[in-house]
Amino acid sequence: MSQTLIQQDPEIAEAIRLETERQEYNLEFIASENFVSEQVMEAQGSIMTNKYAEGYPAKRYYGGCEMVDIAERLAIERAKELFGAEHANVQAHSGSQANMAVYFAACKPGDTVLGMNLAHGGHLTHGSPVNFSGKLFNIVSYGVQKETGYIDYEEVERLALEHKPTLLVVGASAYPRTIDFPAFRKIADKVGAKIMVDMAHIAGLVAAGVHPSPVPYAEFVTTTTHKTLRGPRGGMILCREEFAKTIDSNIFPGIQGGPLMHVIAAKAVSFKEALAPEFKEYSTQVVKNAKVLADALVKRGLNLVSGGTDNHLILVDFTGTETTGKMAEKALEKAGITVNKNSVPFETRSPFVTSGIRLGTPATTTRGLKEAEMERVADWVVRALDNMENDTELAAIKGEVREMCKRFPLYAHLLK
């Protein structure tokens, strides 16, 4: 145990070094990614990784849990304070598992669930046929209006009245506009449905008060703890007190065994960070940056789903052109800008090709980039898309990107 990682496992040590270098010298615009603080990393890499703790604080199936109970209680109380929730379960290993637990708490297999179409901005766990949600439940999907790119609330109401879902799933993984939670509540009440809001993408914005909160309008709210919340990779469920026992039992022993106590400790650290005034400033800047970047891309001739953004996310639509999302993603990666190919509403191409790319500003805002840098990024994006076959030009952009990254360091000291 006295050896360093580079001595004991040089291959993994080198992979970590190269990944640190990639994050340090490229601009991360994948909307679901962010950079955690070194304090979050310290907690996640702590000795708490050694401890098994099946159960919940003060009700464990193992001894020696006094200290991990402290960490989990802190995570729970901070999460409740952050979102104004009556109950929080912080044990979910991921957003998908948080969603699964809510499905099992609210529905029986075969029940009807109304959720957002994946191609229109939803998530795999909102009813995709390749996912457990699509296999175990009768899924009805709603989408966005073709003309506007906004959620079609009239369609949601029509489908709800027609199919009488047990659960109405709200939230998205690629929807750039503010979601009208009161409108969904009214629709759900007309048919006696419960609501699960998956706020994984916007949780940090909600915590900071720069996006409306779903908590007052939904029986269940799920989220990841990374993305805009800027914590470790993991999941969480918020719910009303009346559903606390069924949610907890559907996480453990329902779908999980032992919780990841080192991750829960890191969640607690990130929640404390999100309660600080600086986090509101950060989240406000995330949205400012996204709006400036969206406007700059439109001015430079790109088409955006819904024409812009209200949150952290931008969806570029190449429909009607020869450019595909796959081509754009590869070209931008060569230019030092990381994005992901993404299906767009009314998609005609394969999910492996797509007609769009998704960009988000949480990670670059964490670096310290602001409006002026977003204008520069828009220039680079358009230059890269105009020169997708020109490796020399893409390499030139990458060099310029690297210089900007040096001005806004992340973990540069870890490379010394």
UniProtKB/Swiss-Prot annotation:
One of its GO terms (molecular function) is glycine hydroxymethyltransferase activity. It catalyses: (6R)-5,10-methylene-5,6,7,8-tetrahydrofolate + glycine + H2O = (6S)-5,6,7,8-tetrahydrofolate + L-serine. It comes from Syntrophotalea carbinolica (strain DSM 2380 / NBRC 103641 / GraBd1) (Pelobacter carbinolicus). HAMAP family: SHMT. Homodimer. InterPro entries: PyrdxlP-dep_Trfase, PyrdxlP-dep_Trfase_major, PyrdxlP-dep_Trfase_small, Ser_HO-MeTrfase, Ser_HO-MeTrfase-like, Ser_HO-MeTrfase_PLP_BS, SHMT-like_dom. It is found in: Cytoplasm. Pathway: One-carbon metabolism; tetrahydrofolate interconversion; Amino-acid biosynthesis; glycine biosynthesis; glycine from L-serine: step 1/1. The keyword Ligase does not apply. This is Serine hydroxymethyltransferase. The keyword Ribosomal protein does not apply. The record marks 226 as: Plays an important role in substrate specificity. Catalyzes the reversible interconversion of serine and glycine with tetrahydrofolate (THF) serving as the one-carbon carrier. This reaction serves as the major source of one-carbon groups required for the biosynthesis of purines, thymidylate, methionine, and other important biomolecules. Also exhibits THF-independent aldolase activity toward beta-hydroxyamino acids, producing glycine and aldehydes, via a retro-aldol mechanism. (6S)-5,6,7,8-tetrahydrofolate binds at residues 118, 122-124, 242, 350-352. One of its GO terms (biological process) is glycine biosynthetic process from serine. Pfam families: SHMT (PF00464). Keywords: Amino-acid biosynthesis, Cytoplasm, One-carbon metabolism, Pyridoxal phosphate, Transferase. One of its GO terms (cellular component) is cytosol. Its EC number is 2.1.2.1. The modification N6-(pyridoxal phosphate)lysine is found at residue 227. It comes from the Bacteria. Belongs to the SHMT family. Its cofactor is pyridoxal 5'-phosphate.
